C-alpha cells in the first residue's frame, strides 16, 4: 500500500506536471516485486525499466520476477526492460553469472558498478560517491552508466555511445 500512496501523493501535488522530469527513478525493493512494483508501470509512470542487481541468488530471483512482470505487461504496451546494471557484491564469478542471466532473459548489461569502499565512505557522509568525489574511478563508472541510460537505444545502435 505504501507505493500506491506515494503515487497518489505525487498526483495530488501534480509533481510530474510541475517539474516535467525527463527521468524518474523508482527504487523498489526486490521483495515488493509482486504488488508494488507494478504500480508505476500500470499507471504509465515508466517507459523503460533498468534493473539493478548483484550476482547473488535472491537478487537474481527478484530480477527474474521483475522481468516476468514486464513480459506480462508488454502485451498492454507498458514499460519495457532496458537492461541490467550489475552492482557487484564480490560474489565469486559474479560477472559471468550475471552475463549468463542476461542472456537467458534476453537483455544486456548496461554497466557494472564494482564493489568499492569509496561508496561506503560516501554513505557515511550522507552523500553519493559522485557527490563526494566525481573524479574517483567508481564515480566515473556510475557517470558513464548514467550517460548510457540517457542515450536512446536507437542512437546507441548507431554508434553514439
Predicted segments, located by residue:
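Amphipathic alpha-helical transducer elements in NTP-driven molecular machines
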Residues: 3-7, 57-64, 95, 139-143
Amino acid at each position: 500500500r505504501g507505493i500506491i500512496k506515494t503515487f497518489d501523493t505525487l498526483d495530488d501535488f501534480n509533481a510530474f506536471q510541475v517539474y516535467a522530469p525527463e527521468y524518474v527513478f523508482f527504487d523498489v525493493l526486490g521483495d515488493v516485486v509482486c504488488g508494488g512494483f507494478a504500480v508505476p508501470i500500470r499507471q504509465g509512470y515508466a517507459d523503460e525499466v533498468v534493473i539493478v542487481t548483484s550476482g547473488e541468488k535472491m537478487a537474481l530471483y527478484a530480477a527474474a520476477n521483475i522481468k516476468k512482470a514486464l513480459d506480462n505487461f508488454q502485451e498492454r504496451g507498458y514499460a519495457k526492460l532496458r537492461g541490467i546494471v550489475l552492482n557487484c557484491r564480490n560474489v565469486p564469478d559474479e560477472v559471468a553469472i550475471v552475463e549468463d542471466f542476461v542472456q537467458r532473459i534476453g537483455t544486456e548489461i548496461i554497466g557494472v558498478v564494482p564493489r568499492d569502499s569509496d561508496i561506503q565512505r560516501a554513505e557515511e557522509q550522507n552523500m553519493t560517491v559522485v557527490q563526494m568525489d566525481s573524479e574517483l574511478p567508481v564515480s566515473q563508472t556510475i557517470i558513464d552508466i548514467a550517460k548510457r541510460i540517457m542515450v536512446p537505444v536507437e542512437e546507441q545502435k548507431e554508434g553514439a555511445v
